[in-house]
């Protein structure tokens, strides 16, 4: 059992839970999770397996007044930190509420639910950003957290850039960042600063709009994301930005201003990118003309199949082609409505 001292760990009621044990941070992350770690302490394995077989555990933090949400912790298999009143009983239905007071301004309410398969604990806190950082400090100390994923909605009263800087200044890597607020429009400087704080994330989703005329350095853009990049208002993304993402696995650009000619040039460049990691490209393109996009390239017609609500269906003739890179890697080029899709085999 872990019993952190008050001199090394911020004051927080979590350490009062009797079966809290520390282990290494699991590297694999899934979107919308803040911390992923494993609880495998020998002294709790037998008890937990008896109570919850193959159970996942998830804790979520919601700062409701700012529409800010961060979730942390999903444990596959055994669970060991649900608290005395939960772990001391064998029951098919586990519900409970705990309230911890962190300081004069911050209270944390934990609500436990067990639906027979998954036990979830939801943490509700006041809107102060500092409260989130206090929880981060605590869990970083207890679990030696190295990576975090965050999700938040842009708010004029909320300084997202300062929050992201504060997280990184704690020696924690921003792994997945989800920035919601589809109808929010940011000034160019604010949008740029936000992007700059997220350049080395594995996954990034940016929903807010930025004013027309916004420009962003291609050299900075090339560092974005090893896994997934999604930009909802991508009118500012040029074909040079797209080409620079050779090491990002999947790119989705909505409301883009890329043209058929741009994509023709991009495919020519991609066919020369030996060793590039880029696997999937999904672009919203106005007046999409696939024959113009593949004009002058070496291609073969391919039968395209897509899945939808009605099951699988074939794409119309001329809406799916196959191209090959110089290193032998093949990719399928297709269109669905106004969406251009490239999928590497």
UniProtKB/Swiss-Prot annotation:
Keywords: Developmental protein
Coiled coil: none
Pfam families per the UniProt record, alphabetical: FBA_2
Residue span, F-box domain: 11-55
Biological process per Gene Ontology, one example term: embryo development ending in birth or egg hatching
PANTHER family referenced in this protein's UniProt entry, alphabetically: F-BOX ASSOCIATED DOMAIN-CONTAINING PROTEIN-RELATED, F-BOX-CONTAINING HYPOTHETICAL PROTEIN C.ELEGANS
Cited function: May have a role in embryogenesis.
Protein name: Skn-1 dependent zygotic transcript 15 protein
Species in which this protein is naturally found: Caenorhabditis elegans
GN (gene name): sdz-15
């Amino acid at each position: 059992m872990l019993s952190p001292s008050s001199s090394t760990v911020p004051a927080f009621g979590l350490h009062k839970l009797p079966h809290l044990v520390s282990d290494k941070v699991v590297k694999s992350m899934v979107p919308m999770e803040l911390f992923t770690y494993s609880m495998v302490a020998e002294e709790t394995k037998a008890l937990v397996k008896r109570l919850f077989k193959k159970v996942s555990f998830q804790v979520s933090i919601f700062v409701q007044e700012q529409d800010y949400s961060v979730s942390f912790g999903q444990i596959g298999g055994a669970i060991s930190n649900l608290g005395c009143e939960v772990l001391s009983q064998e029951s098919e239905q586990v519900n409970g509420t705990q309230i911890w007071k962190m300081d004069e301004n911050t209270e944390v309410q934990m609500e436990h639910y067990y639906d027979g398969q998954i036990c979830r604990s939801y943490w509700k806190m006041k809107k102060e950003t500092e409260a989130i950082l206090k929880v981060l400090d605590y869990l970083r100390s207890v679990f030696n957290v190295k990576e975090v994923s965050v999700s938040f909605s842009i708010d004029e009263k909320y300084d997202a850039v300062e929050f992201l800087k504060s997280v990184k200044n704690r020696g924690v890597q921003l792994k997945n960042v989800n920035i919601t607020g589809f109808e929010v429009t940011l000034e160019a400087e604010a949008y740029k600063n936000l992007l700059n704080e997220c350049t080395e994330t594995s996954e990034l989703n940016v929903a807010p709009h930025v004013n027309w005329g916004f420009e962003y350095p291609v050299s900075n853009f090339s560092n974005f994301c090893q896994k997934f990049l999604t930009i909802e208002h991508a009118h500012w993304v040029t074909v040079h930005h797209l080409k620079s993402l050779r090491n990002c696995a999947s790119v989705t650009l909505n409301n883009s201003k890329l043209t058929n000619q741009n994509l023709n040039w991009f495919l020519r460049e991609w066919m020369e990118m030996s060793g590039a990691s880029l696997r999937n490209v999904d672009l919203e393109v106005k007046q999409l003309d696939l024959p113009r996009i593949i004009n002058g390239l070496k291609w073969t017609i391919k039968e395209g199949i897509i899945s939808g609500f009605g099951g699988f269906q074939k794409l119309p003739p001329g809406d799916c082609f196959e191209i090959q890179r110089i290193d032998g890697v093949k990719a399928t080029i297709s269109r669905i409505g106004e969406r251009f899709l490239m999928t590497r085999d």
